[in-house]
Amino acid sequence: MNSLIKSTKFLKKTNIIRSYCTKTNNNNNTNITKNVLSEIEKEKLKRQIIERIIRVDHAGEFGAARIYEGQLAVLANTKEGPLIREMADQEKEHQAKFNQLIYEKRVRPTILSPIWNVAGFGLGYVSALMGKEAAMAVTVAVETVISDHYNDQLRQLNDAGIDDKELKETIKKFRDDELEHMHIGIEHDAELAPLYKPFSELVKVGTKTAIWLSTRV
């Protein structure tokens, strides 16, 4: 009888241990699954951030190059012509780099490129018709917004823990180029343009809107 009681107790303990081990294993498996899913979501988010950055920067550099081309259509043979051409050539270098990145990283370009093609050239052309001061005012406004945008992107990459050295170095270099263009515009009488402040603010709003749309569409 005592032997039977001991056997029964032993079986109960064994079942309890088995149940505990099963629950523990299930919990461990659940935690592992959650961790794997969490890592997948993190990588997916990082990929989305990179895609958005490359898409909008690709569009932005294309638009900037078109602005300078529009200005050159009017001012190519003036004293400011060579300077504008130099800035245009830099923007084309930026555009070529993002053409490379958009291909290598398989990023879908914005569907709005045909609009930025016309709008960029039109803004450059009309501002140049208003005078070289207005053309430089456009340069200052656009490059101010773009350089700030590049700084925001660098912070976003750091906050998300994205260690893409090529992309970061590209953004840093291009930001510095845009800041140089901004200073060139100021040095060449941008602030003497008619209605400089409201005109500049209007261009900035338009540029920010283009950035917002190109990031998403």
Swiss-Prot record:
NADH binds at R52, R216. This is NADPH-dependent 3-demethoxyubiquinone 3-hydroxylase, mitochondrial. Keywords: Iron, Membrane, Metal-binding, Mitochondrion, Mitochondrion inner membrane, Monooxygenase, NAD, Oxidoreductase, Repeat, Ubiquinone biosynthesis. Residues 49-217 are annotated as: 2 X approximate tandem repeats. One of its GO terms (molecular function) is 3-demethoxyubiquinol 3-hydroxylase activity. It is found in: Mitochondrion inner membrane. Component of a multi-subunit COQ enzyme complex. The gene is coq7. Pathway: Cofactor biosynthesis; ubiquinone biosynthesis.
